[in-house]
Swiss-Prot record:
Sequence similarity: In the N-terminal section; belongs to the N-acetylglucosamine-1-phosphate uridyltransferase family.
Organism: Salmonella arizonae (strain ATCC BAA-731 / CDC346-86 / RSK2980)
Entry binding sites for acetyl-CoA: A380, N386, Y387, S405, A423, R440
Gene from which the chain derives: glmU
Active-site residue numbers: H363 (proton acceptor)
Protein known as: Bifunctional protein GlmU
Region of interest called Linker, as start-end residue ranges on this chain: 230-250
InterPro entries reported in the protein's UniProt record: Bifunctional_GlmU, GlmU-like, GlmU_C_LbH, Hexapep, Hexapep_transf_CS, MobA-like_NTP_Trfase, Nucleotide-diphossugar_trans, Trimer_LpxA-like_sf
Listed GO CC annotations: cytoplasm; membrane
Pfam families per the UniProt record, alphabetical: Hexapep, NTP_transf_3
Amino acid sequence: MLNSAMSVVILAAGKGTRMYSDIPKVLHTLAGKAMVQHVIDAANELGASQVHLVYGHGGDLLKQTLKNDNLNWVLQAEQLGTGHAMQQAAPFFGDDENILMLYGDVPLISVETLQRLRDAKPQGGIGLLTVKLDDPSGYGRITRVNGKVTGIVEHKDATDEQRQIKEINTGILIANGADMKRWLSKLTNNNAQGEYYITDIIALAYQEGREIAAVHPARISETEGVNNRLQLSRLERIYQAEQAEKLLLAGVMLRDPARFDLRGNLAHGRDVEIDTNVIIEGNVTLGHRVKIGTGCIIKNSVIGDDCEISPYSVVEDARLDPACTIGPFARLRPGAELLAGAHVGNFVEMKKARLGKGSKAGHLTYLGDADIGDNVNIGAGTITCNYDGANKFKTIIGDDVFVGSDTQLVAPVTVGKGATIAAGTTVTRNVADNELVLSRVPQVHKQGWQRPVKK
């Protein structure tokens, strides 16, 4: 019976030279999240009691980026192979727990595959994840005798006959803690690379008469690693295609699945329609019958039923109640809130502002640090002047207010219910309910005016 306790070791010490970057390889992002974070999340979802992260290059940046994860940090000062990396983590292994070995640059490994690997691990043996490739060049080959796994031969150490083998090692395996420590202590670096290979424990286990169970992933892409940006971009497209397929099968209409990116989590209702080149980031909720036009970016926002977001709008940390419309070219920044039926049109920006039920801001407007009531009309070119160079101040506009075009509201200021602000007005003092307020420079007419000419 398999012990349920399990720790996970994630190898993340490589320099990633072929990325040509100052950022550690495992921190390069896939779907908006560091590659290693995908692996950590899988380990946690699998129920790991502890996640050990073996690091080397860029340790400070790794620790800063992953500071919210409950990790045991294991330093590999010299990169002397995968076996050497595991040797650094071995003192933390419990004898009775299982140890699952993963890689920080293999981001698409699925929880389902890892569950099957864990369940397939024989008592006292090893569970090994393998795949068959048409072109296995460069990979360690799985050797078998009478169908049983007997070892792994690295490509550089393989004979011509062994290089014909199509089944290769993915590097992902699981074994008992006490067994793992014993096998790790027996590793040598007598090979072409002069490194300590974790793969040598397969032969050690076989020599002890232990069973090695080989498991295949649902998709080969789950085990593909990243060594350069071309490989990373390829995995990005594979991941996005998988997410798009899931959404389509769940009833979301993606007009072109190849031109949609999900960089987080999307909860959705029925009959949602998403046009091309839309990016969803963070945690986003779309209600029933939501329509999103081409080129939009939605991040960490809640969009209510029957809302329509027209093309090239950006919505971040915002909330839209049902039946709101925004765009095209609208920008809702953090703290923007639209109540039911509100409308924000083209080139309107909102930040930390609330737009009441049925209220409209149609064109060329900035609403910041504002609380706007119901059924308010905000004319084109209106600006809430909320910043004095040092501090932010609030604008409050009551229900049923009409704000004419080209109005400036110099905060802090309050406009009462039913008030009318004439076009071109600069409001610097509070306005009472139902008042008309206007401030304009007198209009001057000069007959026969001659324009200046260039000298």
